[in-house]
Amino acid sequence: MLTSIATVSLSGDLQEKLDAIAAAGFDGVEIFENDLLSFDGSPADVGKTIRDLGLKLVTFQPFRDFEGMPEPQRTRAFERAERKFDLMEELGTDLLMVCSNVSPHSLGGLDRAAKDLAELGDRAAKRGLRIAFEALSWGKHISDYRDSWEVVRRANHPNVGLVLDTFHIMARKVPLDAISSIPGDKIFLVQVADAPILEMDALSWSRHFRCFPGQGDFPLAEFMRNLAMTGYDGPLSLEIFNDQFRSSSTKNVAKDGLRSLIYLGDGIEGVKVGEKAKTLPPKAHAQEVAFVEFAVEEETADKLAKLFAGLGFEKRGSHKTKAVTWWKQGDINLVINCDKDGFAHSYNIVHGPSVCAVGLKVDDAKATLDRAQSLLAAPFSQAVGEGEIEMPAIRGVGGSLVYFLDDHSELSRIWDVEFEPARTEQSAKAKLRAVDHVSYSMQYEEMLTWLLYFTSIFDLGKM
């Protein structure tokens, strides 16, 4: 499935949005009309920019309050549609997304709606265009995807298809099993969004609290399994209305979005997300915290060593080539790094004395790194000295590092290989035995980012 995101999901002007979408690695983009209206250029300019960035323009949206209108509004609706078709031809897209009517003037009836969609399909076909029909969860007469599918089915037009939007489906708690019976070639667009479960009206919920897949509470894996049974292989697009996202870094939010789509397709049989889709290694099981590393200067290192000793930790070794000491109690390993070169030194300059890295023992360190990189985590590496072991690592919260170790590679010998044993007697009994959990502090606005980051890479749940 082609990965896509609607421009309404991001902050910034249209050029900034398109640049961020392309840089993140999306295959396509949905153009939201407001972004086009505020752009200082022509629709043709927008289309050229999209193509120059290597993106496909998936759809132009939204076209509102169309089906079921009485005269003279019905005639005007078709006139509006023709003007949208003009824009689409300039933009270079063949798909117009039509939302179910919310106008109090609209008339009900699936046959009436189907007739209108069929006529719109005729007009679109004459210009080589297509129509995708979506049921808004607050639609006046059509608010259920099963009804929007019935309208499309009755319209019986090759240029008229269905939009499945996970928010509108799940906000109404509609059963998902009917999706599997819809022919995949009649689904023209799939829009995915997650959200926390909230008791509020659907419109406000939709406009302010949508989030990326994996950040909310919707059963999106079940949706994807049903979608896979249809044979659908079209765009999988994010349409996210979220106040926080629209005030955050355009590039970071776009990257989170693509990560969420890759994660959404992970492990779903018959689903390949992205034009360069590949099978991911399984989620990493973090067996234990292998070590915690502190970045400090020399004076603080002495004070920290005294504190550790007072807490019952014993110095087990000193690094053979660096100003680094290893302290241990039970299965807890603490590292004090006051070396004047390398990552820890730079981290201390920026952050002051602090934890700069956490090492996690996993089943397979290389596979964990591969999965993390496939999910767009930034890998970390630095120069490795003679006799040292290179540990796989990724960037974590606040620019810190997360290292990966395992039992079946040279990583299991890192303490013996890199450290000279301390000449101290070891006490027989430890009062502290293990690290129970790792807790990170972060800005509130970063919570959803790091939630998705860690739960997509590791076998973790949300509490």
Where are these regions (language model features)?
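Conserved beta-strand positions in the central sheet of alpha/beta enzyme cores
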Residues: 30, 59-61, 97, 132, ...
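Glyoxalase I/VOC metalloenzyme domain signal
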Residues: 14, 23, 75, 252, ...
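Acidic-and-aromatic substrate-binding clefts and catalytic sites of carbohydrate-active enzymes
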Residues: 8-15, 32-43, 65-75, 103-108, ...
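Conserved beta-strand positions
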Residues: 5-7, 29-31, 98, 133, ...
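Histidine-acidic metal/acid-base catalytic patches
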Residues: 1-4, 11-25, 51, 92, ...
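Active-site acidic/histidine proton-transfer and metal-coordination neighborhood
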Residues: 15, 67-161, 171, 252, ...
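A structural motif
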Residues: 26, 55, 88, 93, ...
